[in-house]
Amino acid sequence: MRVLTIFLLFMTSIFAVQIKDVANTVGVRDNQLIGYGLVVGLNGSGDGTSSKFTLQSISNLLQGMNIKVDPNDIKSKNTAAVMVTAKLPAFAKSGDKLDITVSSMGDAKSLQGGTLLLTALRGIDGEIYAIAQGSISTGGLTPRPGGTGSHSTAATVMGGANVEREIPQNFSQNNDLTLSLKVADFKTANNIERVLNTVFGEEVAKAIDSRTVKLKKPEDLSNVDFMARVLEQDIAYKPQSKVIIDERTGTVIAGVDVEVEPVLITHKDITIKIDPNNNTVANQNEIDMKDGGFVDPSSNTLRINNAKSTVANIARMLNKLGATPNDIIAIMENLKRAGAINADLEII
């Protein structure tokens, strides 16, 4: 049975959030790390002989242990070549643990149950900042039927790397403090300026544009103390609506108030008609969804006559038709492309 999981986010239009939830401190950011490694111990689900780089990597690894093996003589399918990625947080210290993502490069069928061998993770400057190693489990990434296929060739390993090198920071001596909004918005930038100047009783904040707020630290506070107080302040905030679809698991996450404009879309054999001016009553083949929507399984058609149609309504109706997560993703993308969805669409 094909199943789509739908999560609805219940929220008011405007609510209070802390500044740290909507803005970042410029210069305080994650850094991307990457490395190449081998996963061993796979039960015949590793790379085949067509993945020449894997065979060469095995040979190089063994040669480093004084064991000489010609890559052409290696027939094992218990090893897979992988790329390992991680984020190094700002102010991370030597010995801290990092989560890593391990992704197959070759034709391995699955990484489940394997072990990632010692892998150096480097920054863009080529320096080693972390070392990864550990057991692989892809349990959380098994897709539902009708999904985009197996993703057991990728896995996230919690705490799979140790930080070996710290990135130098001079935050305490930095006199140029700036907030960068995660989503550009003049109203939010203005709210931050107004709240901070009110709290500190002086002109400590100046909104430069829709994304940038310059800060001026009071002389009696350190940078750390000042930013701690700044980031914990509450402001009025209206978030941008968003629809998130996890194509690996077939999960849709959407706010209950994400509206869809009138539109007619056909995808494969599925037709969607959204027309609030159509007062046609349900025919004998249609199922009344009790929310202004009707589903006709005989023709794979859904129509919505309600004045307010939402992503949640459409997702439920598509699920009723038995649409696969692949179909859901394609339809949502087409709705967004047609300008019918008033929200950001994110595929993860």
UniProtKB/Swiss-Prot annotation:
Q: Signal peptide location in the record? A: 1-16
Give the GO molecular function terms.
Answer: structural molecule activity
In terms of superkingdom, the source organism counts as Bacteria
The cross-references to PANTHER family, in alphabetical order and at most eight, read: FLAGELLAR P-RING PERIPLASMIC PROTEIN FLGI, FLAGELLAR P-RING PROTEIN
Key words, A-Z: Bacterial flagellum, Periplasm, Signal
Species, as recorded: Campylobacter jejuni subsp. jejuni serotype O:2 (strain ATCC 700819 / NCTC 11168)
Task: Give GO cellular component annotations, separated by semicolons.
Answer: bacterial-type flagellum basal body, distal rod, P ring; outer membrane-bounded periplasmic space
Any coiled-coil regions, as ranges: none
Q: What is this protein called?
A: Flagellar P-ring protein
Q: Which GO terms describe its biological process?
A: bacterial-type flagellum-dependent cell motility
Signal keyword on record: yes
Its function, per the record, reads: Assembles around the rod to form the L-ring and probably protects the motor/basal body from shearing forces during rotation.
Per its UniProt record, what Pfam families does this chain match?
Answer: FlgI
Subcellular location(s): the record lists: Periplasm; Bacterial flagellum basal body
Q: How does it assemble?
A: The basal body constitutes a major portion of the flagellar organelle and consists of four rings (L,P,S, and M) mounted on a central rod.
Q: Which family does it belong to?
A: Belongs to the FlgI family.
